[in-house]
Amino acid sequence: MAKKKKKIKLNANISRRDFIGGTLVGVGAALLYSYKDVINTVSKDPHGVINDSWTGYGGVGDYAISNGNVASTRDAAHLIRNGFTNKMRADAEETGEEYDMVIIGGGFSGIGAAYEFYKKYGNTKKCLILENHPVFGGEAKQNEFEVDGYKLYGPQGSNDFGPPLKDSGGLIANIYRDTGLPFDYDFVKQDPKKTKVRAPLENYYGVFWEEERYDTGYFMGKDSKTPWVINPRADKLARLPWSDKFKAELNRAFDDKKDYYTGADLDQWLDSMSYKDLLEKVMGFSSEVTEYFDPILAISMGGVGADVYSGYAAKLLEMPGTQARYAYDKSKNDHDVGAYSFPGGNAGIFRHIIKYLIPKSIKGGKSFEEILFNPINFSALDNTENPICMRLNATAIDVSHEGLAKNADYVNVCYHIDGKIKKIKTKTVVMGIGGWVAQNIVSDIPDSIKTAYSQFHHSPILVVNVAVRNWRFLDKLGISSGRWFKGFGRFFSIRRPMITGELTQPFDPEKPAVITFYVPFNNPGYPVKVQGVLGRAELLRKSYAQYEQEIVEQMTEMFAEYGFNAERDIAGIVLNRWGHAYISPQPGFHFGINGEEAPKEVVRKGFGRIQFGHSELSGYMSHTLALIEGSRAAIDVMKHIN
């Protein structure tokens, strides 16, 4: 009989004490009660918040009640998915409000549409953004911790950015100029007396693309002859306990110098097959190589296995064999590589844009540090004096033209807020949300768009931020990033922090830090739709406590031999569950099949006074493409505004 695992107990001061005013906020609190009441109660507790037994500990600060898909937004989305909103719509209260544009979704897509609206109309027209979460930003939110006198931040979802060139044109560069986002960034200088560990400036490059630049470890299991192999690519994987054949295949994949197709239609050719078929049928690799790359695809942008992922989509990730080679250049320093991370991920970018559109949305002035760290002024977001307003905890349940789309002068929007259904009118709508919701709430959606949306598939990710009181155990190991092949999760990383004034985070093994874990839920061997469904079921079924225990056990297994003690060293764990984190483009998604129009192009057409603008339409859900898609949708639909 197997020995029963001893449950590791965390210090009660880590999270169990963190109730709101001594009372646990129940599932759906943000929908059932006044948002103002929730915010006021949160602000009373400096230690942090446990929102409910499923959402769990949220950290401290404004984002503490909005870590990932919290229970309230999950439940509201499932009501929409399951078709329970018809009666709610019939009971809607007409508010008498009328807008020139209503944007559904307060993430990067929505804010990209709002930016375009404001650039054209300034203070002369009215726009309302409806956001279903308790805090704006979509996946561009942050987790905050207070540990031993230090304020620490980690990305909830959207992370990793590269600033445009100062003299460049285009939407993204214009946003930087208008909002005051810097074009140049500095990072904490490494003190070799404190640590010699090389850490990335963001959370991804240490686990594949720039693995040779940074100190990365492969955990082979605590019972392995060599549990950790440090920097395995330094000697072409020689120390890994894998077969010589497999290691030779991986080295050939990493080298990636051969062209496998010379036609002018390379992208279409790649989109005609899965990445697995490219690796195995075209490049001649074994299935072991595919299995090696599967979790890399899953955490970076795909969410699914290579067996259902378009080869062209893999090219967008610069994966081997796609002729978009990512070459490690040792002559560059890591700053020159140009992949950075704000303390709270791309929340730093979003906060600059919202401050530009609604100047009082973040308290204080316009300095870089103030915008990054000052409290959100929630009362300023939905102020009728603003040309652009944002209404939080407002879940859209129905969007439809007033009459036939081709003749309509208005669109009616019904939404749920504070336990009531409200109805407003608008001249135009931008659906800045994913198709898994959009197709269910736009009730007069044409069959052509509905059919196209049936070819959009999405997959989940779990991002876990673990605040530790020190990272001596990583320093002793000599790593900043890690990868493992069995157990909970697959990757973790710490970053060398960005310099952000007085709140610059330390880079010292003796001081606190945030370790970010990426947990994929890919299920190779199943159809693309099924992989997403299975992944979401796994993501959603466990309580916070169950995940907490798995994380602690995994960290203990990997790090206990190097001085790690969970009860002593962990200061907080925040889960960020994203049920539809990624579009998972199957072969044909980008360029169509058998001469048919690609599904994303069908949706981009919109209809009547409603346009769709979400990063999924690019087949690659990044913050820049979200801004671009939202901008495009707004420009298209603004032709209906007089």
Where are these regions (language model features)?
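Conserved flavin/dinucleotide-binding core of flavoenzymes
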Residues: 44-90, 212, 416-417, 467, ...
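Conserved beta-strand->loop/alpha-helix structural units within folded catalytic cores of enzymes
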Residues: 100-115, 130-133, 428-435, 465, ...
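N-terminal secretory signal peptides
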Residues: 1-14, 41-44
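Active-site/ligand-binding neighborhood in enzyme catalytic cores
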Residues: 251-394, 404-408
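Mid-domain catalytic core of redox enzymes
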Residues: 388, 392-516, 520-525
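N-terminal export leaders
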Residues: 15-32
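Active-site rim elements
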Residues: 155-166, 261-268, 335-344, 450-455, ...
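N-terminal glycine-rich phosphate/pyrophosphate-binding loop and immediately adjacent elements
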Residues: 58, 75, 89-267
